[in-house]
């Protein structure tokens, strides 16, 4: 690491709802099982605003999603064709981390476990790659982790028994979100049949991604329409909106026999109206295997099994990425680097960004 700078710029959490750009901060300490990445681009997610609003860690580096190139390897990471200095990668990190305030995506350098970083295929730019990591981490956790839907991780090309077709439907509520863009494609590749909800202007795009059917969530009969379409046998729902209304529609859609409901945020307990449904909300930061020490309800004990599950999932999704077939969510490239990310966080907080992600080049993102 002798050729690297001794300090960097980083967006630091200052107080509740406030991040500031600071200079002169040391690069993150590199763990033995980690790689150090020079950040090329970062992308914004709802939790970039939500986390600093609800559980700020003053002095911590903010940011979850990045793309860049490896500049150093931890002492326990074997240099290989896959992970070597100069390799283009993208990843998801635990920004605003009270236990590791020197590390987050919104900086010039970021450290990430070697087993939880994804190689970027030659056909994909840094800009495109930066839109993926949080959605990919959430997808694997939601669909295949035993704490959540617990679906079997089927290989691409797996055949679904047509006589049991209705039991393989999975409802993806909130099809217009970035996470749903990924989930729908992965479900289809895994042999399941995704159906989704959105505004009508998204219907064509979602069907091109692999959704078998799309439903207008504005319709007062949306829940019953979903149940009818799946012959009263829908057993799996993942809620990418996680509101009172979305939970109610998901519960209406799930068949009489019940099933599993996964929310991406804490769900309203008064909407858990059916004992036959097992509700759970996931927090993707558990994939790192360490305790999450944010304020309640965002505090979680360490889950080493989530780390193991995520590592298996990352190996699978990297192989899918390598095919060049995974479609990214629509995005808008912004200018101004890290300093402009502050305004972007405000726009996300205020609900001004819908249907696309904001991506910020930190340096040259042309390749």
Swiss-Prot record:
It is an enzyme of class 1 (oxidoreductase). Keywords: NADP, Nucleotide-binding, Oxidoreductase. Pathway: Secondary metabolite biosynthesis. Its EC number is 1.-.-.-. It comes from the Eukaryota. Disruption phenotype: Impairs the production of oxopyrrolidines A and B. The keyword NADP applies. NADP(+) binds at residues 47-50, 199-202, 217, 264-265, 353-354. GO terms for molecular function: nucleotide binding; oxidoreductase activity, acting on NAD(P)H. Monomer. Trans-enoyl reductase; part of the gene cluster that mediates the biosynthesis of oxopyrrolidines, polyketide-amino acid hybrid compounds with feature structures of tetramic acid. The polyketide chain is first assembled by the highly reducing PKS module of opdA using acetyl-CoA as the starter unit and five malonyl-CoA as the extender units. OpdC acts as a trans-acting enoyl reductase and reduces the terminal alkenyl to alkane. The 17R in oxopyrrolidine A and 15R, 17S in oxopyrrolidine B are generated by non-stereospecific catalysis of the ketoreductase (KR) domain and enoyl reductases. Belongs to the zinc-containing alcohol dehydrogenase family. This is Trans-enoyl reductase opdC. It comes from Penicillium oxalicum (strain 114-2 / CGMCC 5302) (Penicillium decumbens). The gene is opdC.
């Amino acid at each position: 690491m002798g050729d690297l700078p001794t300090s960097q710029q980083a967006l630091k959490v200052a107080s509740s709802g406030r991040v500031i750009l600071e200079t002169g901060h040391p690069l993150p300490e590199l763990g033995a099982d980690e790689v150090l990445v020079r950040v090329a681009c970062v992308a914004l997610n709802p939790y970039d605003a939500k986390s600093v609003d609800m559980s700020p860690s003053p002095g911590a580096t903010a940011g979850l999603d990045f793309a860049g190139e490896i500049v150093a390897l931890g002492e326990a990471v074997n240099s290989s064709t896959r992970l070597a200095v100069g390799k283009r990668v993208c990843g998801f990190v635990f920004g605003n981390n009270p236990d590791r305030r020197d590390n987050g995506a919104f900086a010039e350098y970021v450290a990430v476990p070697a087993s939880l970083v994804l190689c970027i295929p030659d056909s994909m730019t840094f800009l495109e790659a930066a839109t993926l990591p949080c959605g990919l981490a959430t997808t694997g956790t939601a669909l295949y982790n035993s704490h959540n839907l617990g679906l079997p991780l089927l290989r691409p090309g797996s055949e679904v028994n047509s006589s049991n077709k209705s039991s393989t439907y999975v409802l993806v509520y909130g099809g217009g979100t970035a996470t749903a863009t990924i989930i729908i494609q992965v479900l289809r590749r895994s042999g399941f049949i995704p159906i989704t909800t959105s505004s009508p202007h998204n219907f064509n795009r979602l069907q091109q991604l692999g959704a078998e059917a799309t439903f207008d969530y504005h319709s007062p009969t949306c829940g019953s329409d979903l149940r009818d379409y799946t012959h009263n046998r829908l057993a799996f729902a993942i809620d990418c909106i996680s509101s009172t209304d979305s939970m109610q529609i998901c519960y209406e859609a799930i068949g009489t026999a019940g099933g599993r409901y996964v929310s991406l945020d804490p769900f309203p307990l008064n909407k858990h109206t059916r004992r036959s449904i097992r509700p759970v909300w996931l927090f993707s930061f558990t994939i790192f295997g360490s305790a999450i020490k944010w304020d309640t309800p965002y505090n979680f004990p360490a889950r080493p099994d989530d780390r193991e599950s995520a590592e298996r999932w990352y190996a699978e999704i990297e192989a899918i990425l390598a095919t060049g077939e995974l479609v990214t969510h629509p995005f808008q490239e912004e200018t101004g680097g890290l300093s402009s990310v502050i305004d972007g966080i405000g726009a996300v907080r205020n609900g001004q960004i819908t249907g696309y992600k904001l991506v910020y080049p930190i340096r040259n993102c042309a390749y």
